[in-house]
Regions:
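Periplasmic-binding protein-like
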Residues: 1, 19-21, 115-126, 143
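Hydrophobic alpha-helical segments within soluble ligand-binding/sensing domains
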Residues: 34-56, 159-179
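Flexible loop/hinge segments that line or gate small-molecule binding clefts
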Residues: 11-35, 145-153
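Short beta->alpha junction loops
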Residues: 92-103
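An alpha-beta-alpha
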Residues: 42-89, 93, 183-202
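Single conserved hydrophobic/aromatic residue that forms the stacking wall/gate
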Residues: 204-216
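Short, well-structured alpha-helical segments in soluble
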Residues: 102-116
Length: 216
């Protein structure tokens, strides 16, 4: 992103508030970073995947490799969710080395499908993994926003961001005079991240992932 540039601009314009997404810097005055506990709904989506694989092979299209803590943390949380309901399942990861690369995402998803993965999830920005899953008549789990609109017959649920939860709180803190320039790290309690409703075909045949996780 533009974290360092934003930090510099904040120093040049001390009367303006700057908030940068997905970084870590702050100055305690007029500049901070914000992000979310996306691992929380990732865990729940893992429960969904673990309950619905028949081949016990689950594919994960990842934007970055093990050097990226955001992606790695998401994979770990997803895997913990899978193994909580299906310890026999295996998770196969293919890395695209890009947050947005349609061709690489298609290739990664195709490879996972050729490996007989019957649930595909992703940490990348296009819907191609979902579309390929639908073409192959297997299940998928979306990311960023509700991808069931793109793959209605495949998408079991999506792990989603609701950035408005932070934007509203940040603007209100400026209005109230309570902004302190500290970094923000919200989660499901703050409605910053979440998981969509299960696909209609699962609504009456499976417990919700939240209910299952709460019962453990």
């Amino acid at each position: 992103g533009y974290m360092e540039t934003t930090a510099q601009m904040a120093e040049e314009y001390p009367d303006v508030y700057f908030s940068h997404g997905t970084g870590y810097m702050s100055n305690g005055k007029n500049f901070n970073n914000y992000f979310g506990r996306i691992y929380q709904p990732r865990y729940l989506s893992g429960i969904v995947a673990g309950m619905n694989t028949k081949t016990n092979k689950i594919g994960y299209v990842a934007a970055m490799g093990s050097e990226n803590s955001e992606v790695t943390g998401g994979i770990d949380a997803f895997a913990l969710g899978v193994y909580s309901v299906n310890p026999s399942a295996q998770i196969y990861v293919k890395v695209t080395n890009s947050w947005y690369d349609p061709e690489a995402e298609k290739a990664a998803a195709s490879t996972l499908l050729d490996m007989n993965c019957d649930v595909i999830t992703q940490h990348c920005d296009t819907t191609y993994p979902q579309l390929l899953a639908q073409q192959k008549n297997v299940y998928s789990i979306g990311y960023n926003s509700d991808m069931s609109k793109d793959a209605p017959d495949a998408c079991l649920c999506s792990v989603i961001w609701n950035w408005s939860a932070y934007y509203t709180a940040a603007v209100q803190s400026v209005i109230d005079g309570t902004w302190d320039g500290s970094n923000y790290y919200g989660g499901m309690n703050e409605n910053l991240v979440g998981i969509t409703q299960l696909a209609y075909c699962l609504l009456y045949t499976s417990p919700s992932p939240r209910d299952y996780a709460a019962s453990r």
